[in-house]
Amino acid sequence: MVLSANDKSNVRGVFGKISAHADDYGAETLERMFTVHPTQKTYFPHFDLHRGSAQIKAHGKKVAGALLEAVNHIDDIAGALSKLSDLHAQKLRVDPVNFKLLGQCFLVVVAVHHPSLLTPEVHASLDKFLCTVSTVLTDKYR
């Protein structure tokens, strides 16, 4: 999926407004995913999956960091996330559908905290960005 110049601008605008809360939103995204899609818990058997746990917060920070890295390298997301893609495909062997589920949960978290920010156009741009990130992270599975 190709991001237009307008999509890139919209995504940068969203992350410019949420970056101060990115770590918290990353943790909230994981909490939401584990609630809505409880089968995802199987990938984290060693985690305390209770809301606000230190492990959820730490992994949420990693999720947020990866998304910020993708935004900061929006013209080369594949290059920016190459090592992360290798890790998930070759070592962790995460089911590729999980990235889409995580992206959907992140979109909901942004909508909950910033409803006026997500105009239909911005929503579409952010969704395209998250789908692009998901595609990049699953590329090494082929």
Curated annotation (Swiss-Prot):
Q: Which residues form the Globin domain?
A: 2-142
Binding residues annotated for heme b, in chain numbering? 88
Q: Where does O2 bind?
A: 59
BP term (GO), one:
hydrogen peroxide catabolic process
For this record, the Gene Ontology CC terms, alphabetical, are: blood microparticle; haptoglobin-hemoglobin complex; hemoglobin complex
| InterPro entries noted in UniProt | Globin, Globin-like_sf, Globin/Proto, Hemoglobin_a-typ, Hemoglobin_oxygen_transport, Hemoglobin_pi
* Protein keywords: Heme, Iron, Metal-binding, Oxygen transport, Transport
A Pfam entry, by short name: Globin
Q: What Gene3D superfamilies is this protein classified in? A: Globins (1.10.490.10)
What does the entry state regarding organ or tissue expression? Red blood cells.
> Mind listing the GO molecular function terms for this protein?
haptoglobin binding; heme binding; iron ion binding; organic acid binding; oxygen binding; oxygen carrier activity; peroxidase activity
The entry's function note states: Involved in oxygen transport from the lung to the various peripheral tissues.
In terms of PANTHER family, this protein maps to: HEMOGLOBIN FAMILY MEMBER (PTHR11442), HEMOGLOBIN SUBUNIT ALPHA (PTHR11442:SF48)
Task: Give the similarity note.
Answer: Belongs to the globin family.
Subunit details = Heterotetramer of two alpha chains and two beta chains.
Q: What is this protein called?
A: Hemoglobin subunit alpha-A
Q: Which organism is it from?
A: Ciconia ciconia
User: What broad taxonomic lineage does this protein's source fall under?
Assistant: Eukaryota, Metazoa, Chordata, Craniata, Vertebrata
